[in-house]
Structure formats: structure tokens, C-alpha cells
Amino acid sequence: MTALPPLGAHVSVAGGLTTAFERAEALGCTAIQIFVKNANQWRGKELTGDEAERFRAAHAAGPVGPVLAHASYLINLATADAALREKSRAALAGELARCARLGVGGLVVHPGAHLGAGCDAGIARVAASLDRVLAKAPEVPVRILLENTAGQGSCLGDCLEHLERIRSLVARPERVGVCLDTCHAFAAGYAIHEPSGSEEFWSEALERFGEALAGVHLNDSVRPFGSRRDRHAHIGEGEIGLGAFARILQDPRLAAVPMVVETEPGDEMAGHRRDLEVLRGLVEPKKPKRRKSDRSVRSDRSV
């Protein structure tokens, strides 16, 4: 039987950061992703030493292994707007510092949108921004993980080459990794719904990034192949198909990569539980139901 990779969900921290581990344990997670602050605000409330200590203790005491964080959606490292770029750099630096205090290993961030300036200019700005942020935190043991995108508008990251180019330009590429989202890849035109397309995509990703591939977002897609629209669906309820997820979970090259689902807003826990059950069922053999007659036979034999 194929062993599952570290598998879990993006869990809420409503009620305090440590509640993430309570939700994770209820879902049977062995990996999670969280927000370390409100993702729709530039600044968050101060993280106290006591909060950080309790988070680390809860992590150490439970079944969760890798913990990732997702950076604010407001951050745009690729913009030509100098004021917005500086604000984005400051926000990313702040989240990086929070992750370090909490013991979070990877901080996922979208590369950003060039807003008409062109891909080359945008990629150069992202790399320069990462250099600025990382230079101010030379000893922080947190890797920034660039996430691929669906390719909406002028967003960078719809092709793996963009992420590789950014990493090639930064001064310390070992501190910059990659997190790949299945919905985004499918929407951007990578045929992961087909066996050959899936093999091609993951082989290319591993060739370009190797061990720098440090996270996977397992999301189905509401929109059809190549739509360039980012709309997540529950696993098996979208356009990608269960086969693609089975191939990912059973790929020995990805066995150590933490993978999380990102259910759309709603009944988060119920959605996560269902998605994770579906994913586990693609790898773990289902236990046959015992028939009443079977139980009777066993009972007779025990007399």
C-alpha cells in the first residue's frame, strides 16, 4: 500500500492560533496551512511571546508535521507602483518574522501582477523584492514559497518558467521554494487531468525545482481546462477528475511534500473532512463491510 504524503488542510485560526491544531487533529491532518494574520489586512495585531510559545508547544504535542502559512492576498511584489511595492515588501517581511517565531517552515506567496509593465519587468521586481526582504532576515529559518497562478489578468506564475526565473535571479535561491496549486495549473493550461499531461507537469516541476518544491495545494477546479480562472472546487466535484489526485498522492517523487486542500468558504470543517476522506480513499484500500452472516459464523466458531 502506498503511504500518504503529509496531508491536511488550510485550517482556521479563529479563536487563537493554537486552535489550528485542534481543528487539524479533528480532521486527521498530518500537515496544515494557516494564516498567521488577517490575509485581507496589511497589518495584524502584535504576536506575543506567550502566543508563539503556546503555538510551538501545541505543534510539538500533536500529530501535525509540516506547517505552512499563506501570506496576505494584498501583497504584490511585481507592481511598478513603488509605494505599493514597498508596502508589500514590509508586509511580507512582517509575516516572515511571525512564521519564524511560530516555527512555521514555509510562507506561501503569490508572485504578483505586473499590471501592464510586462512579464520580464515584473519578474525582475519580484526577485529584487525577495532579495530586500530576505536580506533583512539573514538567519530566519523560513523558506518563502512562490505559488503558481491561474494566469488571470497580468498575474505572474501561470507557467513554471516564471517561478524558475525568479529563483534564478535571487541572491539566495535556497531560501525561495515553490508551492504548486492543482487548480491553478489546470486553469493555466497544464493538462494534469490526463495521465500523460500529469506526468509531464510533475516531471517538469521536479526538474526545474527539485527539493525546492515544498508544498502542494490540492484543489479541484470549477472552471474548465485552460480557463485562466481561479475557482476552487471540492475534490471530485470539479473538472480535474479524481485520477489526477490519485496520481499525485501515489507519486513516490512527491511522498515527502506536504499537501493541503483549500476548501471554498462555507462549512469549512465539513468540506475539509469530505475532501480529505476522498483523497485518502484514493490510496488507502477500503475495509470490506462485514455481513451479518459472517459475524454469525465467527460467533459460532468462538463457542
Predicted ranges, named:
Residues 1-71, 75, 79-96, 285-292:
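N-terminal pre-domain/capping segments
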Residues 2, 22-29, 47-68, 93-103, ...:
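Acidic (Asp/Glu)-rich catalytic clusters
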Residues 10-14, 37-39, 71-74, 112-114, ...:
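Active-site beta-loop-alpha junctions enriched in small/polar residues
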Residues 24, 70, 88, 99, ...:
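Conserved, mostly hydrophobic/aromatic
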Residues 30-35, 67-69, 176-182, 210-222:
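Non-cysteine beta-strand/loop elements that form the S-adenosyl-L-methionine
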Residues 77-177:
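Active-site acidic/histidine proton-transfer and metal-coordination neighborhood
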Residues 86, 156-164, 186-256, 270-273:
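Gly/Pro-rich active-site loop or hairpin
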